[in-house]
């Protein structure tokens, strides 16, 4: 349990946590995830690793797919009301992430449930009863709600219900401990109050640091396009790890590897004393993560690819060619999607604007380009990772 305690940003109340551990009983560890996007990022994976650790200590992991709460939208850390997701989109996202999550967690001591199973069945009377478990004053203790209230920014009643629904989830699954990112601490603590309202022993709240995205500034998020997908290729995962700012790699070491905190500190000291180059330490991180997600051979291949393409500036021997349309000017997003470099025009626009597109190693940020400038040129999309997949390297020509 030391592994988890060393990495937790908060354990509240600690006395209750110690009492649960001393009870020697198998505990029910709750983690709720709202399927608001179709992929699993390293940010999600960091928390799922913590849940898996609890399983390895002999406890039961209770994974709640927030198919109901995803329709409401988690207001944590938001300065404005979130857009409402439709149920079809949520169901599609669930179908995408569920198999990935099942492969991360151990099959033994695992329960996966949807909170739609009980929240959708609450009657008006049930909702009134649930609402009476807290007060407006308590809700406004939340920093984000308080800030929006003071700034006269809209707060919908639906947003007030989100943490209540999350708390009711803890009642439904009889959670002993609930884990989550540190931005969830207030919600998890409210869950204690909701459980007490329903005459249950209150859960312990255990939170972990939020993994910062590849931009080095904001938390990893699919909506911000600063994320690393755990289903990406080993080469891309490794390359994206190598692209993160040096100062945040320690968070990745802490949350995404099994190294002891003392071992991570030794790596820090080796850099501080100029014994090691941060770049070399980051290569260790990349190999750790790719090895865990794939295997050691894939990690070695990913590292070799990174060094060949990025450091040695080598390109693949074979580059597919595509015939250019008979037009004077081409709209790059459309072309990149048609020839398979990007999956959609919107993805192409986003990556071009972010400076991730090159024509013969020269960065290009315009959305339109003269056809002659593309002929017999190598088009390279970096996906914000400083390394190109072979499938994202193309040449335009008159074939």
Label each region the model flagged.
Residues 1-9:
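N-terminal regions that are enriched for targeting/export leaders
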Residues 8, 86-87, 91-207, 216:
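Divalent-metal (Mg2+/Mn2+/Ca2+)-assisted nucleotide/phosphate chemistry catalytic cores
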Residues 11-74, 179-185, 191:
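N-terminal catalytic cores of NTP/NDP-binding nucleotidyl/phosphoryl-transfer enzymes
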Residues 72-77, 123-125:
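Short, conserved acidic/polar surface loops in the N-terminal third of protein domains
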Residues 75-91:
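A charged helix-plus-loop insertion that forms the helical arch/lid used to bind
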Residues 78-83, 128-132, 223-224:
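Short, hinge-like loop/turn segments at secondary-structure boundaries
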Residues 194-384, 388, 392:
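Conserved nucleotide- and phosphate/pyrophosphate-binding catalytic cores
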Residues 396-399:
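Hydrophobic alpha-helical segments, chiefly the membrane-spanning helices
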């Amino acid at each position: 349990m030391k592994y988890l305690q060393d990495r937790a940003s908060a354990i509240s109340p600690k006395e209750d946590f110690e009492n649960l551990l001393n009870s020697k009983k198998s505990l029910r560890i709750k983690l709720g995830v709202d399927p608001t996007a179709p992929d699993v990022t390293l940010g999600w994976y960091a928390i799922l690793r913590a849940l898996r650790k609890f399983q390895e200590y002999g406890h039961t992991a209770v994974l709640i797919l927030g198919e109901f709460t995803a329709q409401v939208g988690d207001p944590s850390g938001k300065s404005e009301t979130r857009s409402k997701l439709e149920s079809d989109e949520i169901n599609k996202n669930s179908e995408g992430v569920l198999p990935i999550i099942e492969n991360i967690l151990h099959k033994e001591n695992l329960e996966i449930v949807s909170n739609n199973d009980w929240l959708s069945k609450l009657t008006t009377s049930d909702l009134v009863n649930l609402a009476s478990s807290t007060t407006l004053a308590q809700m406004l203790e939340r920093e984000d709600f308080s800030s929006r209230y003071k700034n006269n920014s809209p707060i919908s009643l639906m947003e007030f219900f989100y943490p209540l629904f999350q708390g009711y989830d803890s009642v439904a699954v009889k959670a002993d401990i609930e884990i989550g990112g540190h931005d969830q601490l207030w919600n998890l603590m409210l869950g204690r109050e909701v459980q007490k309202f329903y005459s249950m022993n209150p859960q312990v709240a255990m939170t972990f640091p939020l993994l910062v995205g590849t931009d080095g500034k904001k938390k990893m998020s699919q909506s911000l396009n600063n994320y690393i997908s755990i289903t990406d290729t080993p080469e891309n995962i490794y390359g994206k790890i190598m692209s993160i700012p040096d100062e945040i790699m320690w968070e990745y070491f802490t949350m995404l590897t099994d190294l002891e905190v003392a071992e991570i500190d030794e790596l820090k000291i080796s850099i501080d004393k100029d014994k090691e180059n941060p770049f070399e330490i980051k290569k260790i991180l990349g190999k750790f993560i790719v090895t865990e997600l794939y295997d050691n051979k894939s990690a070695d291949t990913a590292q070799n690819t990174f060094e060949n393409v990025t450091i040695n500036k080598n390109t693949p021997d074979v580059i597919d060619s595509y015939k250019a349309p008979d037009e004077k000017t081409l709209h790059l997003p459309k072309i990149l999607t048609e020839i398979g470099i990007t999956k959609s025009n919107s993805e192409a626009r986003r990556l071009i604007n972010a400076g991730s597109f090159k024509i013969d190693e020269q960065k290009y940020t315009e959305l339109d380009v003269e056809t002659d400038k593309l002929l017999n040129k190598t088009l390279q999309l970096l996906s914000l990772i400083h390394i190109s997949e072979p499938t994202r390297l193309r040449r335009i020509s008159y074939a």
